[in-house]
Amino acid sequence: SGVNLGQLYLPTQAAAATPTFSQYVEQETQVQRGAGEIHVALVCLRAPHLIDDETLDGIALTMAQLVRLDMQIVLVLNCEDEVVQKNESYREVYRRQGSRVVAALDRHNNEGARYIESALNVTNQESMPASRPKVMGTVELGVPKLITQPLKRGAIPVIPTMAYDTTCKVESVSVSAVMLALTRSLSGLAAVTGSPDKLLEDTSLDRIIMLDPLGGLPTETRQDQAHVFVNLEQEYDMIRDEIKSCGMNPQYLDTLSLVRDCLALLPPASSALLISPEEAAISSHHSRKESTIGITTRRQKNPLIHNLLTNKPLISSSLPVARLSSNGIIPSMSSESATRSTLVKRGMP
């Protein structure tokens, strides 16, 4: 099934129509984007059991739109909370939620999705050679083709936080270990344990996306109580202290720390987006719930699509809060849902 992107391509069309001095620009583009290079966004979906089917369907539509815009998706499934809450094995939990996610993605992405349990390995730290890079951790991408082959076709690999140890026994591993292992591999920093994967060499990890029910980072220093943009080099310590001193959910700090570790392995132009599932699905929800009595409404912008096209936050941190709803950027929101998406960068290029 095709995905109607509406006006999403207009910014890129306008840019293409702008006169440029093409000789220098084209040479620079060839250096930065090799022929056949696969651009990837690494997405972490936390607590899918808290996401209803309609919102999950909207997220899948947004992921399909990103693929249509030439940003391939690797999706990490984080069900740690549900495993703790329910009396069933983590493998059963992940397979149930993985089936939900894959079914939703299959409805919207032309090449569908693949649930992949066997891509990750747990390494033995004691036997690791001294030549291994210091960034190596206990989890690594053991079978790259299980991910790169679907990516080449435009399919979306869905990866649970599970890995096989040296005895071929599967075990649950932390989402941080999985995200860092995939960041290393997709950015070319992982050590090669076997024959190199040419497709892996051609991947470029451009974005980290954290889909979390908590949404973006809250703050008491802004009227709308939301961090719009975070420069980690300048603000990490301050935000960490604020989260601790104000008694905020410690998951915020866990997420921010994970994003910091991932971005430290990527080029300065890379960015991360912390966003709630509801915001990630906002454009599709809007299209379903448009009024049928002839009243036209402005289509709400999707933060993920906007970030892909601009590498900037959806709203300016200096924009007065009163203008957000009037501009159609953010719908009216209750105080409980005031936290919006947060764009995070390692520093300012």
Task: Please tell me what each predicted stretch does.
Residues 1, 291-292, 302, 326:
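Intrinsically disordered, low-complexity cytosolic loops and termini enriched
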Residues 70, 154, 289, 301, ...:
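Glycine-centered secondary-structure boundary/capping sites
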Residues 304-331:
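Intrinsic disorder at enzyme termini
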Residues 9, 25, 140, 277, ...:
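Hydrophobic/aromatic interaction determinants used to assemble and anchor large protein complexes
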Residues 1-280, 329-349:
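Nucleotide/pyrophosphate-binding catalytic subdomain
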Residues 227-230, 288-299:
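Conserved, well-ordered active-site substructure
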